[in-house]
Amino acid sequence: MDVAAMQVKIVDIIANQLGVDKEIITPEANVVDDLGADSLDVVELVMALEEAFDVEIPDEDAESIRTVKDIFDYLAKNKAA
């Protein structure tokens, strides 16, 4: 999967999990502050990303993910080949 396709898929997952419009999901958007996720939403989002990209995101890594760009960067670096 190329980077552009991966980013589209991530945006789709975020929109679905958080119930937000794709238009407000920018790389700089903070998942909690800008997209309105609470702690349960974040856990569910991480689980959805793990399933979609066949990757395990350890809790300590998940805690460092704040923005949509953080998600893009993490998955680009760690997704299964």
Swiss-Prot record:
Pathway: Lipid metabolism; fatty acid biosynthesis
Example GO BP: lipid A biosynthetic process
Predominant location: cytoplasm
Domain Carrier: 1-79
Single annotated GO MF: acyl binding
Post-translational modification: 4'-phosphopantetheine is transferred from CoA to a specific serine of apo-ACP by AcpS. This modification is essential for activity because fatty acids are bound in thioester linkage to the sulfhydryl of the prosthetic group.
Record's keyword annotation contains Nucleotidyltransferase: no
Family as reported in the entry's similarity comment: Belongs to the acyl carrier protein (ACP) family.
Protein purpose: Carrier of the growing fatty acid chain in fatty acid biosynthesis.
HAMAP family cross-referenced by the UniProt entry: Acyl_carrier
Name of the protein described by the UniProt record: Acyl carrier protein
Organism, as annotated: Syntrophobacter fumaroxidans (strain DSM 10017 / MPOB)
